Amino acid sequence: MLRLGRAIAALLAMWAVATDAFAAPIIIVAVGASNTSGWGVADGSAYPERLQVMLRAKGVDAQVINAGRPFDTTGGMLGRIDQSVPNGTRIAILQPGGNDLRFLGSREQRSANIAAMASRLRARNILVIVFDPEIPRQYYAWDGIHLTTEGHAWIAASLLPQVLATLRAGAKPR
């Protein structure tokens, strides 16, 4: 009987290790415009990629999908939000940028679009972080619109504690 118990315990331990090894990573999708996409910086330097590296360094098995699209506005983001953020996503990061105002949109419409995106995502049980801070000027490139490599690092470092807190507060631990 003791052998049977040990055999069952060993099988359960192997099963637990096997299922954990095949567990899918936490999916996080970064939605935005050119700064999210990494316009003007080297591959792997955009904040979504940097955030993924930082999360993994903290022991979080996360895949951060970059759904940034240059020249996009919040209206465009709203129009593609369901396609850009697949089912199974745990967190969506909305980084709306300034194209609405640059392309003569109103602040009110921009705010309404951000609220509508967040509402649609939450209705799908996706946690939402709206990241729309005043980014320090030293992190902008010569054009005053796009971020430098250091600007992307700043965003990733700023988002990291928010993502970790969101995972702790609203998600089942893995």
Predicted segment positions?
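Bacterial N-terminal signal peptides that target proteins for export
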Residues: 1-9
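Cleavable N-terminal signal peptides
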Residues: 10-11, 21
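Short gly/ser/thr-rich secondary-structure transition/capping motifs
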Residues: 12, 74-77
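N-terminal signal peptide c-region/cleavage motif recognized by signal peptidases
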Residues: 16-19
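Serine-esterase "nucleophile elbow" of acetyl-processing enzymes
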Residues: 22-70, 80-88
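Flexible, glycine-rich phosphate/dinucleotide-binding loops
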Residues: 37, 73, 137
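Acidic-and-aromatic substrate-binding clefts and catalytic sites of carbohydrate-active enzymes
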Residues: 40-42, 70-75, 105-108
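Alpha-helical cap/lid subdomain in secreted, periplasmic
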Residues: 50-60, 76-174
